[in-house]
Amino acid sequence: MVAGPLRRVKTIGAYQERRTALKKTSRTCFCVPVPESCRILVIKHSALGDFILALGAFEAIRKAHPDARITLLTTAPYADLAHNCGWFDAVEIDPKPTLLRWRSWLDLHRFVTKSGFERVYDLQHSDRTHTYFRFFGRRKPEWSGIAAGCSHPHRNPDRDAMHTLERLAEQLRDAGIAETPVPNLNWLDGGITEFDLPKQFA
């Protein structure tokens, strides 16, 4: 847990490489029509397994909005993964404050409502993120999720019984994104010498 104000993680190299590749294939991508300067927020806290399963949804959102500025709101343990996957322009760490940490709530409220987001993809679907939706009052952005009153709801009443991959893909279809790929982990890289593994291992 990270207490206090939101902490920003800059994404540079990985994002630029993905953006170059996307521009080469943008004519074949299904794109949701939004202004080129559109600001988009993606929310995904979750556990490690669920975060990995959401990578395909992250990729689909980026391909649907190749020219938008996309920010991920996540928790501290997943900031490095979010940075290295290359689908986001910026990563913000949500401290997930308790009720008594009112200054952190004010910082979070200010970030969510004052950053100029025109569309939000809530991939977390929690009571906490529903509170973020209510932060906006009457002037809400386009919102994909299950918060009551959102503009692009995932309406399937059986969504909780669906596999995470199917549920996220269906949510994005309801928001206008036709295809969601399976998670691609080819970009994952790191040193493993400390584990003293044999040359061949599974």
Regions found by a protein language model. Give the residues of each.
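Catalytic machinery of carbohydrate-active enzymes
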Residues: 2-202
